[in-house]
């Protein structure tokens, strides 16, 4: 009987702590402004700068999903973590690359094909800063991410448009976190990032639609590399946006023979119109981009990360 009471008390205590954690998360989401004061916290094991002056960006083949690993010297960053079924595979792959810690991990928005494996990432790596938009979801996938953050005692950072931070030599600017607080489409709440390294810049669009793209047209968005928004769907990559960005390269993260028909001919036609060289994970597997000075090179490997 005593053991039963202890177990009940333990369960109640765990539930109370979990409920308290969700209150803390809610206060952070409602309050905002947490990002700027806590960002750029140094990695616990951060060492010397990038001696090779070379940045590596892995567009990891996770099928119809996104996961991007950035290695800048001894500092690591992850943007998205694929679907729920990709988590353990991503952990294994990233560990094979020698990754143990992320200075930044970003869940661009609360859709399963972007944060599905993030709970596994949080549980298996040291996360110094976790970035996510203010807009939340009631999905089990999103709850799993919050539970993992709770378990590891990592408080999320809620970025605002215009926020800036650095990895090692690479600098980042938050270009968008949504059109308004009333956004109903989670895609449009994507954390859109501009990365600058030496003489090269890259745009990471998440799943942002043409509506978000239109809001960016008056900003400094001309970049050599574009991570094409929303897997190359017809809802992103408008003619005016591609014309303004003027990318030399477009990376499309997409699953082979996916049911959505991504990338669409509309998107491919626009990219072709502006002479954008396209790299696709469904055709090339994991794509590794190397940046050194103003030189950009690509190689691809069949990682089978998506099973």
Describe every region a protein language model picked out.
Residues 2-307:
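Non-globular, low-confidence helical/coil segments that flank catalytic cores
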